[in-house]
Protein backbone atom coordinates (compact mmCIF):
# COMPACT_ATOMS: atom_id res chain seq x y z
CA UNK A 1 0.00 0.00 0.00
CA UNK A 2 2.79 2.36 0.99
CA UNK A 3 4.63 1.73 -2.26
CA UNK A 4 1.45 2.49 -4.21
CA UNK A 5 0.88 5.69 -2.26
CA UNK A 6 4.43 6.75 -3.00
CA UNK A 7 3.93 6.03 -6.72
CA UNK A 8 0.69 8.02 -6.72
CA UNK A 9 2.28 11.01 -4.97
CA UNK A 10 5.25 10.87 -7.37
CA UNK A 11 2.87 10.93 -10.33
CA UNK A 12 0.90 13.81 -8.81
CA UNK A 13 4.15 15.76 -8.39
CA UNK A 14 5.01 15.04 -12.02
CA UNK A 15 1.60 16.23 -13.22
CA UNK A 16 1.90 19.43 -11.16
CA UNK A 17 5.37 19.98 -12.64
CA UNK A 18 4.08 19.52 -16.21
CA UNK A 19 1.16 21.89 -15.54
CA UNK A 20 3.61 24.49 -14.28
CA UNK A 21 5.81 24.04 -17.33
CA UNK A 22 2.81 24.40 -19.66
CA UNK A 23 1.69 27.55 -17.86
CA UNK A 24 5.25 28.90 -18.15
CA UNK A 25 5.33 28.13 -21.88
CA UNK A 26 1.97 29.83 -22.45
CA UNK A 27 2.96 32.93 -20.49
CA UNK A 28 6.30 33.03 -22.29
CA UNK A 29 4.51 32.99 -25.66
CA UNK A 30 2.27 35.81 -24.48
CA UNK A 31 5.33 37.77 -23.42
CA UNK A 32 6.97 37.20 -26.79
CA UNK A 33 3.94 38.47 -28.70
CA UNK A 34 3.58 41.60 -26.56
CA UNK A 35 5.02 44.71 -28.21
CA UNK A 36 8.15 45.95 -26.44
CA UNK A 37 7.66 48.98 -24.28
CA UNK A 38 9.56 52.03 -25.64
CA UNK A 39 10.27 53.18 -22.06
CA UNK A 40 12.29 50.01 -21.45
CA UNK A 41 10.08 48.78 -18.60
CA UNK A 42 9.63 44.99 -18.44
CA UNK A 43 6.00 44.06 -19.26
CA UNK A 44 5.33 42.46 -15.86
CA UNK A 45 6.98 45.21 -13.77
CA UNK A 46 4.52 47.00 -11.49
CA UNK A 47 6.23 50.39 -11.64
CA UNK A 48 4.60 53.14 -13.70
CA UNK A 49 7.94 54.75 -14.57
CA UNK A 50 11.24 53.04 -15.10
CA UNK A 51 13.43 52.56 -12.03
CA UNK A 52 16.87 54.18 -11.95
CA UNK A 53 18.35 50.67 -11.57
CA UNK A 54 18.91 48.44 -14.57
CA UNK A 55 17.34 44.98 -14.64
CA UNK A 56 19.64 42.29 -13.24
CA UNK A 57 19.64 38.49 -13.27
CA UNK A 58 16.55 36.34 -12.88
CA UNK A 59 17.02 34.25 -9.73
CA UNK A 60 15.49 30.81 -10.16
CA UNK A 61 14.17 29.55 -6.82
CA UNK A 62 12.59 26.31 -8.08
CA UNK A 63 15.33 24.23 -6.51
CA UNK A 64 15.02 25.74 -3.04
CA UNK A 65 13.33 23.63 -0.40
CA UNK A 66 11.43 25.99 1.86
CA UNK A 67 10.74 23.26 4.42
CA UNK A 68 14.37 23.28 5.47
CA UNK A 69 15.33 26.92 5.89
CA UNK A 70 17.56 26.64 8.96
CA UNK A 71 20.80 25.77 7.22
CA UNK A 72 21.18 22.47 5.46
CA UNK A 73 22.63 19.48 7.25
CA UNK A 74 24.97 17.43 5.12
CA UNK A 75 24.69 13.71 4.57
CA UNK A 76 27.98 12.91 6.32
CA UNK A 77 27.83 9.17 5.71
CA UNK A 78 27.57 9.51 1.91
CA UNK A 79 30.24 12.23 1.88
CA UNK A 80 32.57 10.13 4.05
CA UNK A 81 32.16 7.02 1.89
CA UNK A 82 32.83 9.10 -1.25
CA UNK A 83 36.04 10.61 0.16
CA UNK A 84 37.37 7.34 1.62
CA UNK A 85 37.03 5.84 -1.88
CA UNK A 86 39.96 7.97 -3.11
CA UNK A 87 43.70 7.45 -2.67
CA UNK A 88 45.36 9.41 0.12
CA UNK A 89 47.64 11.57 -2.11
CA UNK A 90 44.75 13.15 -4.05
CA UNK A 91 42.79 13.76 -0.82
CA UNK A 92 45.73 15.48 0.88
CA UNK A 93 46.67 17.50 -2.21
CA UNK A 94 43.06 18.68 -2.57
CA UNK A 95 43.07 19.54 1.14
CA UNK A 96 46.25 21.57 0.64
CA UNK A 97 44.62 23.44 -2.26
CA UNK A 98 41.49 24.14 -0.19
CA UNK A 99 43.18 25.07 3.10
CA UNK A 100 46.73 26.41 2.68
CA UNK A 101 45.91 27.83 -0.75
CA UNK A 102 42.17 27.97 -0.11
CA UNK A 103 41.53 31.67 -0.65
CA UNK A 104 43.13 31.67 -4.07
CA UNK A 105 41.49 28.40 -5.21
CA UNK A 106 38.03 29.53 -4.13
CA UNK A 107 38.45 32.97 -5.70
CA UNK A 108 39.53 31.57 -9.06
CA UNK A 109 36.76 28.94 -9.25
CA UNK A 110 33.79 30.61 -7.61
CA UNK A 111 30.40 29.35 -8.75
CA UNK A 112 31.68 26.22 -10.53
CA UNK A 113 32.09 22.53 -9.78
CA UNK A 114 35.79 21.74 -9.97
CA UNK A 115 37.57 18.41 -10.43
CA UNK A 116 40.85 17.45 -8.78
CA UNK A 117 42.97 15.04 -10.79
CA UNK A 118 46.09 13.17 -9.76
CA UNK A 119 48.01 10.28 -11.32
CA UNK A 120 47.56 8.19 -8.17
CA UNK A 121 43.79 8.34 -8.56
CA UNK A 122 42.45 6.19 -11.39
CA UNK A 123 40.00 3.38 -12.04
CA UNK A 124 40.46 0.38 -14.31
CA UNK A 125 37.65 -0.07 -16.80
CA UNK A 126 38.17 -3.19 -18.95
CA UNK A 127 41.91 -2.86 -18.47
CA UNK A 128 41.91 0.79 -19.51
CA UNK A 129 43.11 3.30 -16.92
CA UNK A 130 40.81 6.25 -16.51
CA UNK A 131 41.47 9.14 -14.14
CA UNK A 132 39.14 9.19 -11.15
CA UNK A 133 38.31 12.83 -10.46
CA UNK A 134 37.47 14.24 -7.05
CA UNK A 135 34.56 16.66 -7.49
CA UNK A 136 34.15 19.71 -5.23
CA UNK A 137 31.48 22.39 -5.69
CA UNK A 138 32.50 26.01 -5.14
CA UNK A 139 29.19 27.64 -4.25
CA UNK A 140 28.36 31.32 -4.44
CA UNK A 141 26.20 32.76 -1.68
CA UNK A 142 23.04 32.00 -3.67
CA UNK A 143 23.53 28.35 -4.56
CA UNK A 144 21.72 25.57 -2.73
CA UNK A 145 23.88 22.56 -2.02
CA UNK A 146 22.58 19.01 -2.13
CA UNK A 147 22.99 17.03 1.09
CA UNK A 148 25.70 14.77 -0.36
CA UNK A 149 27.53 17.48 -2.32
CA UNK A 150 31.13 18.27 -1.36
CA UNK A 151 31.90 21.94 -0.73
CA UNK A 152 35.29 23.27 0.49
CA UNK A 153 33.95 23.53 4.06
CA UNK A 154 32.50 20.02 4.07
CA UNK A 155 35.62 18.61 2.42
CA UNK A 156 37.92 20.15 5.03
CA UNK A 157 35.61 18.97 7.81
CA UNK A 158 35.44 15.35 6.69
CA UNK A 159 39.13 15.00 5.72
CA UNK A 160 40.36 16.59 8.96
CA UNK A 161 38.14 14.18 10.88
CA UNK A 162 39.31 11.12 8.96
CA UNK A 163 43.05 11.70 8.49
CA UNK A 164 44.48 13.89 11.31
CA UNK A 165 47.66 11.77 11.62
CA UNK A 166 48.48 12.13 7.91
CA UNK A 167 47.82 15.88 8.14
CA UNK A 168 50.13 16.07 11.17
CA UNK A 169 52.94 14.20 9.40
CA UNK A 170 52.75 16.52 6.37
CA UNK A 171 52.07 19.61 8.48
CA UNK A 172 49.16 20.83 6.31
CA UNK A 173 47.66 23.85 8.01
CA UNK A 174 45.22 26.62 7.27
CA UNK A 175 46.83 30.11 7.23
CA UNK A 176 44.43 31.35 9.91
CA UNK A 177 45.54 28.54 12.26
CA UNK A 178 49.16 29.46 11.61
CA UNK A 179 48.42 33.02 12.66
CA UNK A 180 46.82 32.07 16.00
CA UNK A 181 49.87 29.99 16.93
CA UNK A 182 48.53 26.51 16.28
CA UNK A 183 51.94 24.92 15.68
CA UNK A 184 53.22 26.34 18.98
CA UNK A 185 50.10 25.03 20.73
CA UNK A 186 50.37 21.43 19.45
CA UNK A 187 54.15 21.13 19.79
CA UNK A 188 53.95 19.45 23.21
CA UNK A 189 50.30 18.42 23.15
CA UNK A 190 50.77 15.20 25.14
CA UNK A 191 52.30 17.04 28.16
CA UNK A 192 49.94 19.98 27.79
CA UNK A 193 46.76 17.87 27.89
CA UNK A 194 48.12 15.62 30.66
CA UNK A 195 48.80 18.63 32.90
CA UNK A 196 45.35 20.02 32.05
CA UNK A 197 43.60 16.77 32.98
CA UNK A 198 45.31 16.71 36.38
CA UNK A 199 44.30 20.27 37.32
CA UNK A 200 41.44 20.80 39.77
CA UNK A 201 38.08 21.39 38.08
CA UNK A 202 36.01 24.28 39.49
CA UNK A 203 32.75 22.71 38.24
CA UNK A 204 32.93 19.50 40.28
CA UNK A 205 31.80 19.29 43.87
CA UNK A 206 32.48 15.63 44.66
CA UNK A 207 30.58 14.01 47.51
CA UNK A 208 33.55 12.70 49.43
CA UNK A 209 32.59 10.09 52.00
CA UNK A 210 34.36 10.45 55.34
CA UNK A 211 37.35 8.18 55.54
CA UNK A 212 38.14 8.41 51.80
CA UNK A 213 41.93 8.58 51.24
CA UNK A 214 43.10 12.14 50.51
CA UNK A 215 44.62 11.01 47.21
CA UNK A 216 41.29 9.66 45.94
CA UNK A 217 39.40 12.76 47.10
CA UNK A 218 41.91 14.90 45.22
CA UNK A 219 41.53 12.76 42.07
CA UNK A 220 37.73 13.17 42.10
CA UNK A 221 38.13 16.95 41.71
CA UNK A 222 40.27 16.75 38.57
CA UNK A 223 39.32 17.85 35.07
CA UNK A 224 39.74 14.23 33.97
CA UNK A 225 36.70 13.25 36.04
CA UNK A 226 34.63 16.06 34.52
CA UNK A 227 35.63 14.81 31.05
CA UNK A 228 34.57 11.27 32.00
CA UNK A 229 31.14 12.59 33.01
CA UNK A 230 30.91 14.50 29.73
CA UNK A 231 31.79 11.30 27.83
CA UNK A 232 28.88 9.51 29.54
CA UNK A 233 26.50 12.28 28.41
CA UNK A 234 27.80 12.09 24.81
CA UNK A 235 27.52 8.29 24.70
CA UNK A 236 23.76 8.60 25.19
CA UNK A 237 23.25 11.11 22.35
CA UNK A 238 24.36 9.30 19.22
CA UNK A 239 22.91 9.94 15.75
CA UNK A 240 22.58 6.76 13.64
CA UNK A 241 24.04 8.31 10.48
CA UNK A 242 27.23 9.50 12.16
CA UNK A 243 27.64 6.15 13.95
CA UNK A 244 27.44 4.45 10.55
CA UNK A 245 30.19 6.76 9.24
CA UNK A 246 32.43 6.08 12.27
CA UNK A 247 32.02 2.29 11.84
CA UNK A 248 32.74 2.54 8.11
CA UNK A 249 35.87 4.64 8.75
CA UNK A 250 37.09 2.19 11.42
CA UNK A 251 37.18 -0.61 8.84
CA UNK A 252 39.66 1.28 6.60
CA UNK A 253 42.76 3.52 6.82
CA UNK A 254 41.37 6.59 8.62
CA UNK A 255 42.92 7.59 11.93
CA UNK A 256 40.28 9.61 13.76
CA UNK A 257 41.16 10.16 17.44
CA UNK A 258 39.10 8.26 20.01
CA UNK A 259 40.33 10.34 22.93
CA UNK A 260 41.19 14.02 23.49
CA UNK A 261 44.60 12.83 24.80
CA UNK A 262 45.56 11.21 21.46
CA UNK A 263 48.66 12.89 19.99
CA UNK A 264 46.73 13.67 16.77
CA UNK A 265 43.62 15.10 18.50
CA UNK A 266 44.27 18.85 17.96
CA UNK A 267 45.29 18.19 14.33
CA UNK A 268 41.63 17.58 13.55
CA UNK A 269 41.36 21.40 13.55
CA UNK A 270 44.59 22.17 11.66
CA UNK A 271 42.76 23.12 8.47
CA UNK A 272 40.19 25.25 10.30
CA UNK A 273 37.06 23.20 9.56
CA UNK A 274 33.93 25.29 10.10
CA UNK A 275 32.46 22.74 12.54
CA UNK A 276 33.61 19.75 14.59
CA UNK A 277 34.18 16.81 12.21
CA UNK A 278 31.52 14.11 12.61
CA UNK A 279 34.07 11.34 13.23
CA UNK A 280 35.17 12.79 16.57
CA UNK A 281 32.03 14.61 17.67
CA UNK A 282 31.38 11.99 20.37
CA UNK A 283 34.83 12.35 21.95
CA UNK A 284 34.58 14.40 25.14
CA UNK A 285 36.22 17.81 24.74
CA UNK A 286 36.87 17.62 20.99
CA UNK A 287 34.00 19.82 19.78
CA UNK A 288 34.88 22.28 22.55
CA UNK A 289 38.55 22.35 21.48
CA UNK A 290 37.40 23.51 18.04
CA UNK A 291 35.28 26.20 19.69
CA UNK A 292 38.36 27.32 21.66
CA UNK A 293 40.30 27.73 18.38
CA UNK A 294 37.42 29.68 16.83
CA UNK A 295 37.41 32.06 19.83
CA UNK A 296 41.15 32.58 19.30
CA UNK A 297 40.48 33.42 15.64
CA UNK A 298 37.85 35.96 16.69
CA UNK A 299 40.21 37.52 19.25
CA UNK A 300 42.94 37.76 16.66
CA UNK A 301 40.51 39.47 14.28
CA UNK A 302 39.56 41.94 17.00
CA UNK A 303 43.19 42.78 17.68
CA UNK A 304 43.98 43.01 13.97
CA UNK A 305 40.83 44.88 12.95
CA UNK A 306 42.81 48.01 12.24
CA UNK A 307 40.68 48.93 9.22
CA UNK A 308 37.40 49.23 11.14
CA UNK A 309 36.93 52.30 13.29
CA UNK A 310 35.33 52.26 16.72
CA UNK A 311 36.08 50.94 20.17
CA UNK A 312 37.44 47.46 20.75
CA UNK A 313 34.01 46.45 22.00
CA UNK A 314 32.31 47.48 18.77
CA UNK A 315 34.94 45.59 16.82
CA UNK A 316 34.32 42.51 18.94
CA UNK A 317 30.60 42.70 18.15
CA UNK A 318 31.39 42.86 14.45
CA UNK A 319 33.91 40.08 14.59
CA UNK A 320 32.47 37.31 16.73
CA UNK A 321 31.49 35.40 13.63
CA UNK A 322 33.76 32.32 13.72
CA UNK A 323 32.69 31.21 17.16
CA UNK A 324 28.98 31.78 16.49
CA UNK A 325 28.96 29.92 13.20
CA UNK A 326 31.13 27.09 14.61
CA UNK A 327 28.62 26.60 17.43
CA UNK A 328 25.63 26.74 15.13
CA UNK A 329 27.07 24.30 12.63
CA UNK A 330 28.36 21.83 15.20
CA UNK A 331 25.09 21.82 17.11
CA UNK A 332 23.17 21.21 13.89
CA UNK A 333 24.89 17.80 13.88
CA UNK A 334 22.92 16.80 16.94
CA UNK A 335 25.05 17.59 20.00
CA UNK A 336 25.05 20.44 22.49
CA UNK A 337 28.48 21.87 23.29
CA UNK A 338 29.49 22.05 26.93
CA UNK A 339 30.33 25.73 27.52
CA UNK A 340 32.13 24.84 30.76
CA UNK A 341 34.79 22.84 28.92
CA UNK A 342 35.37 25.80 26.57
CA UNK A 343 35.78 27.96 29.67
CA UNK A 344 38.28 25.49 31.17
CA UNK A 345 40.35 25.66 27.97
CA UNK A 346 40.22 29.47 27.99
CA UNK A 347 41.32 29.66 31.63
CA UNK A 348 44.11 27.15 31.06
CA UNK A 349 45.55 28.25 27.71
CA UNK A 350 43.82 31.47 26.66
CA UNK A 351 46.34 33.95 28.06
CA UNK A 352 49.34 31.93 26.87
CA UNK A 353 47.95 31.73 23.31
CA UNK A 354 47.09 35.44 23.12
CA UNK A 355 50.50 36.45 24.49
CA UNK A 356 52.17 34.13 22.02
Swiss-Prot record:
Location relative to the cell: Virion; Host cytoplasm, Host perinuclear region; Host Golgi apparatus, Host cis-Golgi network
The GO terms this record gives for MF are: endonuclease activity; RNA binding
Q: Where is this region: Interaction with glycoprotein N?
A: 37-205
Q: Which domain of life is it from?
A: Viruses
Region: Interaction with host UBE2I/UBC9; residue ranges are: 145-148
Region Viral RNA-binding: which residues?
132-174
Question: What top-tier enzyme class does this entry carry?
Answer: hydrolase
**What do we know about how this protein assembles, alone or with others?**
Homotrimer. Homomultimer. Homomultimerizes and binds to viral genomic RNA to form the nucleocapsid. Interacts with host MAP1LC3B; this interaction participates to the protection of Gn from virus-triggered autophagy. Interacts with host SNAP29; this interaction participates to the protection of glycoprotein N from virus-triggered autophagy. Interacts (via N-terminus) with host RPS19; this interaction probably mediates the loading of the 40S ribosomal subunit on viral capped mRNA during N-mediated translation initiation. Interacts with the viral RdRp. Interacts with host SUMO1 (via N-terminus).
User: Could you identify this protein by its name?
Assistant: Nucleoprotein
Amino acid sequence: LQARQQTVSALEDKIADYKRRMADAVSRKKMDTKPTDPTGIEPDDHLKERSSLRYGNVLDVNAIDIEEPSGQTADWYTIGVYVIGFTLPIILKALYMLSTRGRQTVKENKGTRIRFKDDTSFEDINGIRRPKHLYVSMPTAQSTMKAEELTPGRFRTIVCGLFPTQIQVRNIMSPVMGVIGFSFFVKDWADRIREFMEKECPFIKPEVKPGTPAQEAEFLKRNKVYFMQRQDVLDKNHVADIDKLIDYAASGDPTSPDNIESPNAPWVFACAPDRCPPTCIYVAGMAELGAFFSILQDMRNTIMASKTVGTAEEKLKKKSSFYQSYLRRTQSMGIQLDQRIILLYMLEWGKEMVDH
